[in-house]
Curated annotation (Swiss-Prot):
This is Large ribosomal subunit protein bL20c. GO terms for biological process: translation. Its main location: plastid. Gene3D superfamilies: 6.10.160.10, Ribosomal protein L20. Belongs to the bacterial ribosomal protein bL20 family. Keywords: Plastid, Ribonucleoprotein, Ribosomal protein, RNA-binding, rRNA-binding. Binds directly to 23S ribosomal RNA and is necessary for the in vitro assembly process of the 50S ribosomal subunit. It is not involved in the protein synthesizing functions of that subunit. It is found in: Plastid. The lineage of its organism: Eukaryota, Viridiplantae, Chlorophyta, core chlorophytes, Trebouxiophyceae. GO terms for molecular function: rRNA binding; structural constituent of ribosome. The keyword DNA-binding does not apply. One of its GO terms (cellular component) is plastid. It comes from the Eukaryota.
């Protein structure tokens, strides 16, 4: 079996990882082992917090929608059920924006929903 020399690949890999850790404090930016561990933890936290941020925005959007819907004695879960059954493709973000910038349009939509319920 032939011997494999990896000096250049190893140097490139180390440089790549050390470049990612620029600005970290102490040995975390200059020592390879510490840098590798710090980057793993940073990537894990970034992944987790991206999911958390999305959950947070969903909560905010639902709260905004609910704020307007409560004045009609309707809550978000009922509207969500209505959207799904009628195959209407409006997500939380769009409905939230409409409730802030164009509440009249959302009122028309709610009246349509109430009329649909009366027909059933």
């Amino acid at each position: 079996m032939t011997r494999v020399k990896r000096s250049i690949q190893r140097i490139i890999k180390k440089e790549f990882i050390l470049k990612k850790a620029k600005g970290y404090k102490g040995g975390n930016s200059s020592l390879f082992k510490a840098t590798k561990q710090t980057l793993l933890k940073a990537e894990k936290n970034a992944y987790r917090d991206r999911r958390y941020k999305q959950r947070l925005w969903n909560k905010i959007w639902i709260t905004r929608i609910n704020g307007l819907l409560r004045s009609y004695n309707i809550n978000w879960s009922v509207i969500k059920f209505f959207l799904k059954n009628n195959k209407i493709k409006l997500n939380r973000h769009i409905l939230s924006q409409v409730s802030i910038y164009d509440p009249v349009l959302l009122q028309i939509y709610i009246l349509f929903y109430i009329n649909t319920l009366c027909r059933i």
